[in-house]
């Protein structure tokens, strides 16, 4: 049964503008707003963020904070102040040795930065929870099959990761992705999120943590290997409350969407979490608007607890807006109102 419907939102500037947008969200059946808080917002607009959270609460919306694009470790088009200020503490290519424009989340420098970012916002804003938005290693970006191929390069091969690997396994970190490297990357990738989630729950036990991972096959022949594709390891983390999988393009086969959705629910149930599936509410739109209702029904029938869409108004006015952004927004809203049984 779907009991929460979410939309992401970038407008963290003025409370009076956000208030009107929040009312529009409610009119579209939204029960929870995910505030995409950037590093720039944190440094520049922070005095207004608690007021915006308060206004959303006043209007009856739940609020999650998404550290959007933070360190370029999370999904998002935003630039990163951490990377601007740190020429080190970056992910490094295993094949070329190049430093990349992605923070290495295994370094203490980034882990401290990220934890301070989140704990500060939790103290000042009193949100209902936090949303870990597509965390990932920079590489591989292509399909990683058991035969190698386009995804042979991977991260992170920085001095911190290499030392930590050698300290744990007792031999130097290889430059190709062995089973030890895979396990090391999965395990280390969870540390920054687990530690920060634990700190947030120590601050307020009622804070809810949603971890949203890439919607990938992760089977015997094909796996993504970007750090969070081992869904069992993510699902069993004791500090996560909601297991979420990200957007699937409308142009992909319905069976693929169904498979991702059913596996999402299965992992969530296995580890006693709530399940969440995302709809593509920006950039692309279905050829047939009835597909939105069909995919929403697939999620409902599979037992999904929550639906979410990126982003408010279909990305209207941005370079990633859908061709008919407002129509997409309205269609998602119609389906939210149709299926959501709030607090059921």
Tell where the protein language model's regions lie, with residue ranges.
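The substrate-binding groove and active-site-proximal loops of carbohydrate-active enzymes
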Residues: 5-13, 34-43, 96-115, 174-190, ...
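Aromatic-lined carbohydrate-recognition surfaces of secreted/lumenal glycan-active proteins
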Residues: 6-10, 64-68, 131-135, 179-227, ...
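Catalytic domains of carbohydrate-active enzymes, especially glycoside hydrolases
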Residues: 15-42, 124-127, 236-243, 298-307
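Aromatic-lined substrate-binding rim segments of carbohydrate-active enzymes
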Residues: 21-22, 35-85, 184-203
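Active-site-adjacent "subsite" loops/lids of carbohydrate-active enzymes
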Residues: 64-125, 165, 175-179, 290-292
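Substrate-binding cleft/loops of secretory-pathway carbohydrate-active enzymes
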Residues: 140, 193-196, 203-255, 284-298
């Amino acid at each position: 049964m779907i009991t929460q419907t979410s939309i992401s939102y970038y407008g963290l500037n003025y409370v009076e503008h956000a208030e009107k947008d929040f009312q529009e969200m409610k009119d579209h059946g939204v029960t929870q707003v995910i505030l995409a808080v950037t590093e720039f917002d944190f440094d520049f607009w922070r005095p207004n963020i608690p007021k915006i959270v308060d206004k959303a609460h006043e209007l009856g919306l739940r609020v999650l904070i998404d550290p959007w694009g933070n360190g370029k470790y999370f999904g998002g088009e935003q630039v990163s102040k951490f990377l601007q200020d740190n020429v080190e503490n970056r992910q490094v290519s295993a094949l070329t040795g190049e430093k990349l424009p992605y923070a290495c989340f295994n370094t203490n420098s980034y882990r401290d930065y990220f934890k301070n970012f989140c704990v500060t916002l939790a103290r000042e804003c009193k949100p209902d929870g936090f949303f870990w938005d597509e965390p990932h290693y920079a590489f591989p970006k292509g399909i990683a099959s058991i035969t190698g191929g386009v995804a042979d390069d991977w991260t992170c091969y920085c001095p911190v990761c290499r030392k930590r690997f050698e300290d744990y396994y007792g031999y130097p970190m290889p430059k190709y992705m062995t089973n030890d490297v895979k396990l090391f990357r999965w395990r280390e990738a969870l540390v920054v999120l687990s530690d920060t989630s634990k700190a947030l729950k120590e601050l307020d036990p009622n804070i809810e943590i949603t971890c949203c991972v890439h919607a990938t096959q992760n089977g015997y022949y094909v796996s993504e290997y970007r750090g969070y594709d081992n869904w069992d390891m993510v699902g069993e983390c004791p500090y996560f409350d909601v297991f979420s999988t990200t957007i699937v393009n409308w142009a992909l086969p319905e069976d693929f969407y169904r498979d991702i959705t059913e596996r999402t629910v299965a992992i969530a149930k296995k580890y006693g979490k709530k399940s969440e599936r995302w709809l593509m509410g920006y950039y692309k739109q279905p050829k047939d608007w009835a597909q939105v209702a069909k995919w929403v029904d697939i999620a409902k029938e599979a037992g999904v607890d929550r639906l979410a869409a990126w982003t408010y108004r279909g990305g209207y006015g941005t370079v990633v807006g859908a061709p008919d952004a407002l129509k997409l927004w309205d269609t998602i809203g119609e389906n939210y109102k149709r299926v959501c049984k709030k607090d059921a």
